[in-house]
From Swiss-Prot:
It catalyses: ATP + H2O + proteinSide 1 = ADP + phosphate + proteinSide 2. ATP binds at G503, R504, S505, G506, S507, G508, K509, S510. The lineage of its organism: Bacteria, Pseudomonadati, Pseudomonadota, Gammaproteobacteria, Pasteurellales. GO terms for molecular function: ABC-type transporter activity; ATP binding; ATP hydrolysis activity; ATPase-coupled lipid transmembrane transporter activity. It is found in: Cell inner membrane. One of its GO terms (cellular component) is type I protein secretion system complex. The chain crosses the membrane at residues 159-179, 192-212, 270-290, 296-316, 389-409. It is a multi-pass membrane protein. Part of the ABC transporter complex LktBD involved in leukotoxin export. Transmembrane domains (TMD) form a pore in the inner membrane and the ATP-binding domain (NBD) is responsible for energy generation. Signal peptide: none annotated. This is Leukotoxin translocation ATP-binding protein LktB. Residues 155-437 form the ABC transmembrane type-1 domain.
């Protein structure tokens, strides 16, 4: 009845869905009580106020249909008749609109005519304030500005050294001019000796300062590199589960590896080349003093360098993008193949996998070759411009010398100065190509760093958990356009109660526990522990007090003791052994040569499946959590190991709330209460013998199947 009542107020339904899209939980009844004062549904003004109260930034606009593709979606299409709906995507190529019908609770694809018939020109754009802050602080090249400011003293030292290097670069051509025009003409050997010694001193200082500049600059960029690497890893571990579930492992690894490209660019000659280019204005002034005509030739060549880069860059960027995509595909396929090596060998499908790898590798090599060819063409184009300018300067300079407007020494000095000007330009042309690749790397890495971390409406570290759990009117789906996983689930679990949850695959059993761990926020309703809404709780505080054992558990490449004491490496050995005994793992650990110091290998490869599972159970128990979740935890155990754990179950459950999810009904038959789920709803609940009395019930049906 309550859900139907909410469905009548489509504005409230839309607000609930958009809030969930932005990882914000709300209580519809509370919103209705505060903002729907006349009981007729949310008005436009009250809707905007309600959104603001949820830390959402909402704006009412009027937009023509032809410009809808420019707005941020999803957005709410506001209708004066109350028949609001969500606009999810605009397909401009096919003139189609992906919408979400709030009344029918289903996505719809509308044609141009159908959309025009129901669109009244009013939109409400919605974004979270956290998203706005995130956009302002998004990862791009501006991220390095605070780092430059932080290490401004070091960069100032680099700038000072660069000034001296440019002065030395300016002095050297003057020495050559004096030698050509004065020393050779007047046969001044003493002057020649003085100039030679001075030039040698300048060269020594130039070499020392150049090396010092490279050292100081590399040292500062290495610090920035460490900061970026640390920030990247912290951010990666703070991302929500949904980020990893929607991306391939290899793709994520490939994006993280793009840090190497950025590192190489920064620690190279990028910024030093820019500094050298800035000092070129001084060289131009000296060159103009020597010969305005020759200087104009040099200046006239600069637009050609720029135009050539403008022509090459878009093509190069597209090819680099394609190269990265193929590299990410290869990385993902390689990770998948290594992870599934047992299956590949067991099914003897190595030839098929090799064939797929060969095709993908060939595509990557071809894409990489196209990038190399285009980069080579770009470099050769720059060389062509440089050589052409050199020939023109040689011809024009010779004419000026012959006509007496320029001395030979001045011509040589001018050519040396022009080399000092053109060299940074050529380096920048090469760096511009590198910059295109780094731009791709920044974009790819930004997919990680710009993704919002787990968000919540506060960081409430509540008191120690007692164990009362409440699911109220829970409605949940993993995506707005995905099927409903949980529908109007209401469940009360008392402190210290042992609850078994059974049902067919896909009935929503594991999803309940994910909501309890706050991996996701329900679309509607509340999850409470000891009366506290988990939407307001600090996820780390919550998860430290919940023990979880899954069907497939991952062990780290460390010792058994370190794996069990993962959350508290300094815990006493007695606690580790006690947890291992409860999990039935102590006996087999004692038989190992290194005992608790045995390294388990990557993902626990050095142990059997049952042994890994028992260590995972010990890891969940070692912190004495007040809530314990067993999600098919014993399904991978042999009967003897399962028997040991079931014998210890009374001790395991003592003083804590336990949720047992199982397909094997024998695992849950002694539970205080058994919850039976079907298609996201609770269809039965009671004790084992009570449920068997209903011969037409799902539990009896599953029990009969297992008996047979």
């Amino acid at each position: 009845m309550e859900a139907n009542h909410q469905r009548n107020d489509l504005g409230l339904v839309a607000l609930t869905m958009l809030a969930q899209y932005h990882n914000i939980s709300l209580n519809p009844e509370e919103i209705k009580h505060k903002f729907d004062l006349d009981g007729k549904g949310l008005s436009l003004t009250s809707w905007l106020l309600a959104a603001k109260s949820l830390a959402l930034k909402a704006k009412h606009i009027k937009k023509e249909i032809s410009r809808l593709h420019l707005v941020n979606l999803p957005a709410l299409v506001w209708q004066d008749n109350g028949k609001h709906f969500l606009l999810v995507k605009v397909d401009t190529d096919n003139n189609r609109y992906l919408t979400y019908n709030l009344e029918q609770d289903a996505p719809q694809i509308l044609s141009q005519d159908e959309f025009e018939a129901c669109y009244q020109g009013q939109l409400i754009l919605v974004t979270s304030r956290a998203s706005v802050v995130g956009q302002l602080a998004k990862f791009d090249f501006t991220w390095f500005i605070p780092a430059v400011i932080k290490y401004r003293k070091i960069f100032l030292e680099t700038l000072i050294v660069s000034i001296f290097l440019q002065i030395f670069a300016l002095i050297t051509p003057l020495f050559f001019q004096v030698v050509m025009d004065k020393v050779l003409v007047h046969r001044g050997f003493s002057t020649l000796n003085i100039i030679t010694v001075a030039l040698a001193i300048v060269i020594i200082f130039e070499i020392v300062l150049s090396g010092l500049r490279t050292y100081v600059f590399s040292h500062s960029t290495s610090r920035i590199d460490v900061e970026l690497g640390a920030k990247l890893f912290r951010h990666l571990l703070s991302l929500p589960i949904s980020y990893f579930e929607n991306r391939r492992v290899g793709d994520t690894v490939a994006r993280v590896r793009e840090l190497d490209q950025i590192r190489n660019f920064l620690t190279g000659q990028a910024l030093t080349s820019v500094l050298d280019l800035l000092f070129s204005f001084i060289f131009f002034a000296v060159m103009w003093y020597y010969s305005p005509k020759l200087t104009l030739v040099i200046l006239g060549s600069l637009p050609f360098y720029i135009l050539w880069s403008i022509f090459i860059s878009p093509i190069l960027r597209r090819r680099l993008d394609d190269k990265f995509a193929r590299s990410a595909d290869n990385q993902a396929f390689l990770v998948e193949s290594v992870t599934a090596i047992n299956m590949i060998k067991a099914m003897a499908v190595a030839p098929q996998m090799t064939d797929t790898w060969d095709k993908q590798l060939a595509s990557y090599v071809s894409s990489s070759f196209r990038v190399t060819v285009l980069a080579t063409i770009g470099q050769q184009g720059v060389q062509l411009i440089q050589k052409t300018v050199m020939v023109i300067n040689l011809w024009l300079g010779a004419h000026l010398v012959i006509s007496g407007d320029l001395s030979i020494g001045q011509l040589i000095a001018f050519n040396m100065l022009s080399g000092q000007v053109i060299a940074p330009v050529i380096r920048l042309a090469q760096l511009w190509q590198d910059f295109q690749q780094v731009g791709i790397s920044v974009t790819r890495l930004g997919d990680v760093l710009n993704s919002p971390t787990e968000q919540y409406q506060g960081k409430l570290s509540l008191p120690e958990i007692k164990g009362d759990i409440s699911f109220k009117n829970i409605r949940f789906r993993y995506k707005p356009d995905a099927p409903t996983i949980l529908n109007n689930v209401n469940l009360e679990i008392r402190q210290g109660e042992v609850i078994g949850i059974v049902g067919r695959s896909g009935s929503g059993k594991s999803t309940l526990t994910k909501l309890l761990q706050r991996f996701y926020i329900p679309e509607n309703g509340q999850v409470l522990i000891d009366g506290h809404d988990l939407a307001l709780a600090d996820p780390n505080w919550l998860r430290r007090q919940i023990g979880v054992v899954l069907q497939d558990n991952v062990l780290l490449n460390r010792s058994i003791r370190e794996n069990i004491a993962l959350s508290d490496p300094g815990m006493p050995m007695e606690r580790v052994i006690y947890a291992a005994k409860l999990a039935g793992a102590h006996d087999f650990i004692s038989e190992l040569r290194e005992g608790y110091n045995t390294i388990v290998g990557e993902q626990g490869a050095g142990l059997s499946g049952g042994q890994r599972q028992r260590i995972a159970i010990a890891r969940a128990l070692v912190n004495n959590p007040k809530i314990l979740i067993f999600d098919e935890a014993t399904s991978a155990l042999d009967y003897e190991s399962e028997h040991i754990i079931m014998q210890n179950m009374q001790k395991i459950c003592q003083g804590r709330t336990v949720i047992l999810i199982a397909h094997r009904l024998s695992t849950v038959k002694n539970a205080d209460r058994i919850i039976v789920m079907e298609k996201g709803e609770i269809v039965e609940q009671g004790k084992h013998h009570e449920l068997l009395q209903n011969s037409n019930g799902l539990y009896s049906y599953l029990h009969q199947l297992q008996l047979n």
